[in-house]
A protein has these predicted regions:
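C-terminal capping/gating helix-and-loop segments adjacent to ligand/active sites or protein-protein/ligand interfaces
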Residues: 351-354, 370-424
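Short, solvent-exposed loop/beta-turn-alpha elements that line the ligand-binding surface or hinge
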Residues: 119-131, 175, 196, 200-201, ...
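Periplasmic solute-binding protein
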Residues: 106-111, 135-172, 181, 200-226, ...
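A structural signal for short loop-to-beta-strand junctions that line the ligand-binding cleft
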Residues: 94-95, 125-163, 194-198, 299-300, ...
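Short, low-complexity disordered leader/linker segments with a strong preference
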Residues: 1-37, 60, 421-428
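Extracytoplasmic "Venus flytrap"/periplasmic binding protein-like
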Residues: 57-131, 138, 166-169, 175, ...
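Extracytoplasmic/periplasmic substrate-binding proteins
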Residues: 41, 55, 244-328
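Glycine-centered hinge/linker elements that transmit conformational signals in sensory
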Residues: 184, 228-258
């Protein structure tokens, strides 16, 4: 990866030294456990299909272990995280659970003493050579590694229906915010029901996802990252300008559908009733699972204003302290981090492998393009999906966005103040 792509504290050589020189509590043992419970929010569509492929491999490798799928539906884990927190507080941790790389894993779980150190597992599996060093750092605290990345998703993707765009006179993907607004006007004049597809349900996470993208597109990567380092103010002019862009985008949405979840809202693209949709690349897997065809029913481009920028997130699996079926969990983690596991999971999930040696012949044209961009673009961590923010900030961001929208998307200054307060509460 490139300088400036993901902000790091230590170099790759330090990570390699830690992996080869540290012991950990994650010592290997044969899986003699009779049960294994995995906790995710992958309950439907392409997400469930991807998980299912991984589960099938696990069952084949561990035929004596009963697999318990404890998935809790809800995009971005808004429901699952609340259930997980209650379970862990009650001493009822699942054997492994899904968490995003970055501050979600590091601050929300590892720093709270809720996860076992997996450094020895990385050593035994050779993952220091299989995963990008910068990505390993996003699961590392005080030299210890706490989760296993299974994929890479791209958050800043623009989706549209080619036939709908052609009818509106749109012949190429917009590359700038100004070009996107010009195209939204074309959709509007052509009678497209929803020029900008919005999804305000499921705790407003998809609207926070849209804001996350707008901040990067409007401010640029450095100013955006400064929001979390302290060099950019949430109440400063850069955010104020970005919120004007956000407010303007919302004006092109269908206000009657603001309560829709992302899947229900996004169906407007493949049905031809929607114009543009900013959503992560899991949308492609969802649509393909519903029978849509890439290139015919929908197509893609980097979000306008973010060409050459890859706003990323990574799903990872953990080993909670106190897991009842620890050996079964270790078997799951080994599979999740393996080439076989990742190449079975990711083509169906709509993501690329976290590993650097995946077989790209198994991936569709969108995912091949994502892999190429991941290797060359400027990488920026997603806030809405846990890279640059912990669970506390994400919940506050979702609440602030929900409040803003329910108030008619009018109080930009109030939204900025709420986001500043959320950040201040985290860094205290």
């Amino acid at each position: 990866m490139r300088k400036g792509s993901i902000r790091l504290i230590a170099a790759a050589s330090v990570i390699a030294l830690a992996i080869t020189g540290c012991s950990s509590s994650s010592d290997e043992a044969a899986n003699t456990d009779t049960e294994f419970e995995i906790f995710t929010w992958w309950a439907s569509g392409g997400e469930a299909a991807g998980l299912g492929a991984l589960v099938d491999l696990y069952k084949a490798q561990n035929p004596e272990t009963e697999f318990i799928n404890a998935s809790v539906a809800g995009g971005a884990g808004v429901n699952a995280k609340a259930v997980l927190e209650s379970r862990m507080a009650a001493g009822d941790a699942p054997d492994s659970f899904q968490a995003h790389a970055g501050l979600e894993v590091i601050a929300s779980y590892a720093a709270q003493g809720k996860l076992e150190d997996l450094t020895a597992l990385y050593q035994s599996e050779g993952w220091d050579k299989s995963f990008p060093a910068d990505l390993i750092k996003q699961t590392t605290l005080d030299g210890k590694i706490y989760s296993v990345p299974v994929n890479i998703h791209r958050a800043n993707v623009l989706w549209w229906n080619p036939a709908t765009a052609a009818k509106a006179g749109i012949t190429k993907a917009p590359e700038t915010l100004d070009e996107m607004f010009a195209d939204l006007e074309k959709f509007k004049k052509a009678g497209v029901k929803t020029p900008m597809v919005l999804a305000g349900g499921e705790g407003s996470w998809a609207m926070a996802h849209l804001l996350d993208y707008v901040l990067v597109a409007s401010m640029g990567p450095e100013k955006f990252e400064g929001l979390f380092s302290g060099s950019t103010s949430w109440t400063g002019p850069e955010v104020a300008e970005a919120l004007k862009v956000y407010q303007r985008l919302l004006s092109y949405g269908d206000k009657g559908k603001n309560s829709f979840g992302w899947g229900e809202a996004g169906a407007a693209i493949t049905k031809g009733t929607g114009g543009f949709f900013i959503m992560g690349d899991w949308a492609s897997a969802q649509w393909q699972n519903e029978g849509a065809v890439l290139g015919t029913d929908y197509t893609f481009a980097p979000g306008p204003g973010t060409v050459g920028i890859y706003q990323w997130l990574s799903d990872t699996f953990t080993l909670p302290v106190g897991a009842k079926n620890r050996n079964a969990a270790l078997a799951w983690l080994k599979l999740s981090g393996s080439k076989e596991g990742q190449d079975a999971f990711n083509p169906l999930k709509g993501s690329i492998a976290a590993r650097t040696d995946s077989d790209l012949s198994l991936y569709d044209d969108y995912l091949k393009s994502a892999a190429a961009d991941w290797a060359k673009d400027r990488l920026v961590g997603s806030t809405a999906h846990g890279v640059t923010a912990d669970n506390k900030f994400m919940a506050s961001m979702n609440a602030a966005v929900g409040k803003y929208i329910s108030g008619g998307a009018k109080d930009n200054a109030g939204l900025a103040k709420d986001l500043a307060a959320a950040q201040a509460a985290v860094v205290k």
